[in-house]
Amino acid sequence: MINLGDKQSTIVVAMSGGVDSSAVAAMLHEQGHNVIGITLQLYDHGMAVGKKNACCAGQDIYDAKMVANKLGIPHYVLDYESKFKESVIDNFVDSYLQGETPLPCVRCNKSVKFRDLIKTARELGADKLATGHYVRKINGDNGAELYTGLDPAKDQSYFLFTTTKEQLEYLRFPLGGLTKDETRKLASKFGLEVADKPDSQDICFVPDGNYKSVINKIRPNSSESGKIIHVNGFKLGEHSGIINYTIGQRRGLGIAYNEPLYVVKIDPKDNIVYVGPESALNVQEFIIRDVNWLADEIKDNEKLEVAVKIRSTRPPRLAEISKLGDDKMKVKFLCAEKAVAPGQACVIYAGERVLGGGWITREIR
């Protein structure tokens, strides 16, 4: 059993209705803490009722309530639909219209699940907020530090890089040292019906993976056709709207050529999709913005050798970073990397520790 090392406390658990957060609630309850379950309804209930593997709506709210009832803990469902739409869905749509590849789960963790939920937990008089994320918080010489989960297959640190130092002090991640199988065994031990429940999908508000329908619903007539141009400057055809393309895409381009072509750049201002050979995807350096830094301050003109991840599914790559003003950094790979997509996150590591991260901009070379 994982013990948080805290004295008996009042702890709010963010309960999504899945096995992870349910196991956290049961674990903390058994340890004698005063546990309060909170579930956020984040998007249209009607959309979610018939959707498998969603989260934060429909069946999942019911499952969270059933777990809370079994444990005998108070449980509240909070309507966060308007906050979620404003902070996450609208940003998701606007990012695609700007030719970016958005990362809504990070936006949700930053604005809704942490910022707003921590505020609610404090208002309830809670000492801490616990979640089912697979990351670790370790107390260092200068306060709380964020580390990867011990199970590489479930590590979620990439999605939590925007967590602030102040938030880290308040948060608890009881599952950071466990594997998914160990979590399911814990849930079975506690007799929770969700022990074998499948994991939710990444983008909870996109039915059947059709993000274009979400964009067209919120921004009608957003799929304006335009030119597809080769990186060497000649026109190859027409596209059906930049929302249908992402950096590194090969399939579905609808053009014939004598070698495989990939999307290498999207220009929202002139509504142009640029394509080229695989070699054109190589990127040596780029700029990140809105940097959240969790380690010791980097001095101006100081260069730091680190590992970075530019996609959640990619392994870390060696790079050199340097500070550019208050909220920007330059990232330079030791070896060129393919398909660096504006709108995605670049998360910076020193071993298993998360040093910080930021959002990839169009300043790519």
Curated annotation (Swiss-Prot):
GO terms for molecular function: ATP binding; tRNA binding; tRNA-uridine 2-sulfurtransferase activity. SUPFAM superfamilies: Adenine nucleotide alpha hydrolases-like (SSF52402). Gene3D superfamilies: Adenine nucleotide alpha hydrolases-like domains, HUPs, Translation factors. ATP binds at A14, M15, S16, G17, G18, V19, D20, S21, L40, G132. Its EC number is 2.8.1.13. It is found in: Cytoplasm. GO terms for biological process: tRNA wobble position uridine thiolation. GO terms for cellular component: cytoplasm. Keywords: ATP-binding, Cytoplasm, Disulfide bond, Nucleotide-binding, RNA-binding, Transferase, tRNA processing, tRNA-binding. The active site is at C108 (nucleophile), C204 (cysteine persulfide intermediate). Catalyzes the 2-thiolation of uridine at the wobble position (U34) of tRNA, leading to the formation of s(2)U34. This is tRNA-specific 2-thiouridylase MnmA. The gene is mnmA.
